[in-house]
Amino acid sequence: EKDTVDFQLNFDDSEKEPTVLPTRIPNLLINGSSGIAVGMATNMMPHNLSESIDGCIAYIDNRDITIDELMQHVKAPDFPTGGVIYGMEGVKAAMHFGRGRVVVRGKLTVEAKANGKEQIIITEVPYQVNRDALTNRIGELVNEKTIEGISHVNNESNNKEGTRVVIDLKKDAIANVLI
């Protein structure tokens, strides 16, 4: 009606569809996307809302902005489950070429218990890592004797407190070695 965007014929030429879907904010960049089709797949990482808006404003102000200049506004993906991105080379490759390997590690702390044993407390997990699956996998590795020094693993996460995966260590285990 308002002639906002161009239209093109759909896959079977039966009707016209918009070439883009206008929006007030860059939803795809903010929310990310993951999908598989015949012969191709896509994974777009989510980004911070305010950084994304700043990036859009910078692009509007300078249509010839370079990717490096744009990355001063949109610095890196922003994962809803937290975690720490290790190395920016993968992020830079993803921004420049649409492909890149981004390594994300969870956040953890080591706590000493009253009985002298230590616990590893995981408070953030990488994006799309299921906490129950993580807990089960650690348990499997302990049972297979691939990892030694762990006496118990428990997922104490909840909606109120957030992520909390507790790994109890055996008395002689050294947390920094297991990490």
Residue ranges and their predicted role:
Residues 1-5:
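Proline-centered turn/helix-capping motifs that create local helix->coil transitions or kinks
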